[in-house]
Amino acid sequence: MAQDATQIQFTEYNFKYNFEDVGFLRMGVTAAELGFRYVQVNDAAQTTGIIAISKNGVAPTLRVEMLQTQYETIFGNIAGDQVYPIVDGAKIAYGIGDRKVSLFELAKPGILHPVGVDDDDYANDIYFHLVVPDLSSVSYGGNRDNAQTVTMNFFVLRDSTKSADFNYGIFGDWTATTNA
């Protein structure tokens, strides 16, 4: 991925996993610090969480903290019946199944798109070729009186079918980029 952080001009991004909106991010001073907030949780509350890009070995890691939410796409599409929230007040019930999945099969594009920019204007996007959730990292927090939290890591994988310069992702118009 291009390392020139000066290309990052916006402070708020929509976060898309497999081209689906899942929330929005607040950018810090560097590309390594991103804040994350779900737009919708339930009718009674709006809560916040954290997402950060950090190095984990040779691959960057997206660490995502998601607060109690009614978004079924995150858990339904990613984990099937393995992990699922049931919203009841401030509580989340969850279940772990024995279904096995390959994280590489779940790897999808991840996109940071600036808030307030037209959906078809990709000039300032931050595009990751392959983003995958680490289901083994799912943890739960909170108590009866506070919002429950679900924390899960997302890994950014290298895509060897892309050019050597852009094998993690690119800044800018990713729709105009071809494989080298």
Where are these regions (language model features)?
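Beta-strand secondary-structure signal
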Residues: T61-E65, I111-H113, T151-F155
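Charged, amphipathic alpha-helical segments
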Residues: T69-V101
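Acidic, glycine-rich flexible loop segments
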Residues: D98-G141
